[in-house]
Curated annotation (Swiss-Prot):
InterPro entries named in the record: Asp_de-COase-like_dom_sf, Asp_decarbox
UniProt-annotated catalytic positions: 25, 58
Protein name (record): Aspartate 1-decarboxylase
Gene this chain is encoded by: panD
Chain's role: Catalyzes the pyruvoyl-dependent decarboxylation of aspartate to produce beta-alanine.
Gene Ontology CC, one term: cytosol
């Protein structure tokens, strides 16, 4: 049996743009993608912290070090520049490995510069305890 687990997330990134007329996707600074282990064209969920909307799209690489987080295509109607979002990717893993699995978490500042990168371990000083 497989379990769907959080593979990685870019936590509380700031949307730098929204391009309604682009084909679709989310453009993410390629350095952030590498840190979060997100590949080009990989499916990602976007959770808009500012407005509570959620949608799925796919990632494309933006200029490294630019901090770009740009929502493209129809999903551009679901965000505004300056909104705070969480970008999540998923993995299917064997059930017997799920309990020990730890996702990659990339925390960024308001310019989308990474501040920390860590794994989340519930119950041991993780985000779960902070909520």
């Amino acid at each position: 049996m497989k379990r769907k687990m959080l593979k990685s997330k870019i936590h509380r990134a700031t949307v730098t743009g929204a391009d309604l007329h682009y084909e679709g996707s989310i453009t993410i600074d390629s350095e952030l993608m590498k840190q979060a282990d997100i590949l080009p064209y990989e499916a990602v969920d976007i959770w808009n912290v500012t407005y509570g909307t959620r949608f799925q799209t796919y990632a494309i690489e933006g200029q490294p070090g630019s901090g770009v987080i740009c929502i493209n295509g129809a999903a551009a109607r679901m965000v505004s520049k300056g909104d705070m979002v969480i970008i999540a990717s998923w993995i299917d893993i064997d059930a017997d490995k799920a309990a020990a699995y730890e996702p990659k978490l990339v925390f960024v500042d308001d310019k989308n510069v990474p501040t920390t990168q860590k794994s989340e371990n519930p119950g041991q000083g993780s985000l779960r305890n902070a909520i």
